[in-house]
Amino acid sequence: MPATTPFLWFDGTAEEAARLYVSLFPNSTIDEVMGTPGSAMGVRFTLDGAPFIALNGGPMYQFTPAISFQIACADQAEVDHYWEGLTAGGGEPGQCGWLKDRFGLSWQVNPAQLGSYLGGSDAAGAARAQQAMLGMGKLVIGDLRRAYEGEA
């Protein structure tokens, strides 16, 4: 199967965005800056082993929430790390673990176990967890677990 690489269109902030993302994710690197650093045409970078390309394409296209990147976090510390890092500097918190970073790119910052709470064998617990999630911006694993278990 051919390799697939997300190609992200920015309006002059490709290098800044790539540097932010690389600073937040482990096993991440700036692989190539195409053009002059500081006014790059594009940036090839790797986020936790996955290749990406960012292009300074101009104002013609904007990101929408119809496309987002999901981060499956192992624990609350990871949720907090990505949430704080991606909303810093003008990002916008959203509902149910969604956010928009300061470049307009949408992310879902979710605990890895979210699916087991929302789709677990206990239908009433799943409904409680979903209701709890609907009231959250940043997801709080302990609150989701307590809702699922009927302790909230």
Regions found by a protein language model. Give the residues of each.
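Core segments of cupin and vicinal oxygen chelate
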Residues: L8-A50
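Vicinal oxygen chelate
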Residues: T4-D11, A14-E15, M41-T46, M60-S106, N110-L114, G120, ...
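Terminal peptide-recognition signature
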Residues: P6, Y21, F45, L86, ...
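C-terminal cap/linker of serine protease catalytic domains
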Residues: S121-A152
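Conserved "turn/edge" positions that cap or connect secondary-structure elements
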Residues: F7, L47-D48, Q113-S116, A123-A126, ...
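Sec/Tat-exported extracytoplasmic proteins
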Residues: F25-T29, G90, G137, Y148
